[in-house]
Amino acid sequence: MAVITIGGVTKDYAVGTTYEQIAQEYQEQYNNTIALVTENGKIRELHKKVSKDADVKFITLSDTIGHKTYERSAIMLFVKAVHDIMGKDVRIKVEFSIGKGLYCAIQGDKKLDDNSIKLINKRMNDMVAADLPITKKPYP
């Protein structure tokens, strides 16, 4: 068991419990979706597991870091969908933000058309529905 302190309240959790499971217990206390946690001051993704006693704080989508994490996840989802539909030889450049959106340029031999846009949108929705995790992989 690990002792987890959240907002001054301590509770025992089994080692191996994910921060997502813990966040689900507290989500109703927050106006915005919990996106990340800090474990003893270090940012952790929700799929990470409890391994030791820790002081935990929740980061929501209304927090700057939570919003940036959400934005990066949306970009990765978009890039994956474009590559799945148009091929990996297509290059995607995230140029700048426009209001609450992002301007992205797709470069390569293949041209973007209405059908490609529909297929990319469908692929993104399918991946969201499948609840596929986004995981980090270290590269040398």
Where are the predicted features?
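Eukaryote-biased recognition of intrinsically disordered, low-complexity regulatory segments
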Residues: 1-10
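Short amphipathic, charge-patterned alpha-helical segments
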Residues: 17-29
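Short acidic beta-strand-loop surface patches of small beta-rich interaction domains
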Residues: 33-48
